[in-house]
Regions:
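Helical element adjacent to the flavin cofactor pocket in flavoenzyme catalytic cores
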Residues: 140, 147-148, 173-235
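Glycine-rich active-site loop/strand segments that organize a redox cofactor
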Residues: 74-103
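Flavin (FAD/FMN) cofactor-binding and adjacent substrate-gating region
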Residues: 2-17, 84-90, 114-195
């Protein structure tokens, strides 16, 4: 299970600026419900919300606090498309079916927007996202994708910016050009997650914190999920723990399909008027390298800058300085700026970077492998699973058809493979 010492949120800029929110109770006694969801991040909550809104009984068990993992620590980018790119989807299912997947990715972003509006979630939601190209070959790849997206996916909202046009919006000389997406955007991930949790609870879902799953066993009516001092009997089981997928033997098979990649984020001091000159249209930015930088401004004018793979570096101060050096490559004018917050976390990726969710058994569902696109895709994953539980698996089935190669499961070799893979792609990015 999650390290038992991790009962509370780990320090981060997001935790320090979290909206007032309740502490949900620890599960006591034995309860019975239609669906039990293990995991109180966005995967689980975005499954619980539509179930509860449709009058379905649902319990969510969170081992630590709501949004404790990636949902409350990420860069906050809400992005259409998939991390694998539409080329991988096309290769697997063909262009016509890939167009359906494309529409799902667009709907994922709009689902975030509509839920923020419907439930009045205060999470600094801001439209605008740019993919930037560091090297000439990256710019060529970006232009090719832009043309393909226009021709086959009707992506007329995309704008292609050359170096001069990009410079009008971004105070950096590092990039060759960019593709701007006015529909994608960024938000405060912890506050968004807390808002979805409140919406689910208001709709009737029962949420429990500090209630780690310790054991699962079949019972007459479905499944019995144990926590340290209690249990939940349920018909349907949803395993929504992402990077913690291998924590229970029954779900060890999921560990073969996704691996946790570490990432690190720093937050500067408030930049005041300098922030407006840094990113003039307040968009989120990510480059299109394999080992990439991602950054954006916070609502109070800080630069939040993330990247790196800290798999073999356990010193937070060292990681802070490494990411700061990457920030200064993009914005050397920030050399005098203090770093006030730094934190790390894990992102689960599949081998081909396509999302991985579906069923392990008729009443056992899972979601993982968003590969950096989880702020948006969790909404569609949760909706697809909820719809399937309620009898309509039309949205879930196509995602189940996506093929995923196995990843080695031995812990040290997973870490080593992740590290060596990162180094290989860093080399590839620079050549």
């Amino acid at each position: 299970m999650i390290n038992p010492s991790f009962k509370e949120y780990l320090p981060s800029y997001y935790v320090s600026t979290a909206n007032p929110h309740p502490s949900y109770p620890t599960l006591e006694g034995r309860l019975k419900t239609e669906t039990c969801i293990i995991g109180g991040g966005l995967s689980g909550l975005c499954t619980a919300l539509p179930l509860a809104e449709n009058g379905h009984e649902v319990i969510v068990l969170e081992a630590a606090r709501i949004g404790f993992g990636a949902s409350g620590r990420s860069g906050g980018q809400v992005i259409s498309d998939f991390a694998c790119g539409m080329e991988e989807i096309e290769k697997q299912v063909g262009l016509e079916q890939a167009q359906w997947f494309w529409q799902q990715s667009l709907q994922a972003v709009e689902l975030v927007d509509s839920r923020i509006q419907k439930h009045n979630i205060q999470c600094d939601w801001q439209r605008g996202y740019a993919t930037v190209a560091v090297r000439p070959q990256h710019w060529e790849e970006l232009q090719q994708w832009h043309e393909h997206a226009q021709k086959h996916y009707g992506a007329s909202h995309y704008q292609l910016w050359d170096k001069a046009t990009l410079k009008q919006q971004l105070a950096s000389d590092m990039y060759q050009g960019a593709q701007f997406d006015p529909l994608s955007g960024h938000l405060h991930p912890l506050n968004y997650t807390l808002g979805i949790a409140k919406a689910a609870a208001d709709a009737g879902a029962q949420l429990f914190e500090q209630s780690p799953m310790t054991r699962i066993e079949p019972c007459d009516n479905g499944w019995l999920v144990h926590t340290p001092n209690s249990s939940v009997e349920c018909k349907n089981l949803v395993y929504a723990v992402n990077t913690y997928a291998g924590l229970h033997p029954k779900f060890k098979v999921l560990e073969q399909k996704a691996i946790a990649i570490s990432t690190f984020i720093i937050a500067t001091e408030p930049l005041g008027e300098r922030a407006k000159d840094l990113i003039r249209n307040n968009m989120a930015i990510c480059d299109n390298r394999h080992v990439l930088d991602y950054y954006r401004l916070s609502a109070d004018g800080r630069l939040l800058f993330g990247g790196k793979d800290n798999e073999f570096i356990d010193d937070p101060d060292r990681m802070t300085e490494l990411v700061r050096q990457d920030m200064l490559k993009v914005f050397p004018q920030l050399a005098d700026v203090r770093i006030e917050h730094s934190w790390g976390g894990e992102c689960d990726i599949t081998r081909n970077l396509a999302p991985h969710f579906g069923r392990l058994a008729p009443t056992v569902f899972f979601a993982q492998g968003y590969s950096g696109h989880g702020m948006a895709i969790t909404g569609i994953a949760g909706l697809a699973i909820a719809e399937a539980i309620m009898g309509d698996d039309g949205r879930l089935k196509p995602f189940e058809q996506l093929r995923h190669s196995n990843i080695i499961t031995q812990p040290f070799l997973r870490k080593l493979g992740s590290y060596l893979g990162s180094k290989y792609y860093q080399w590839k990015d620079s050549h």
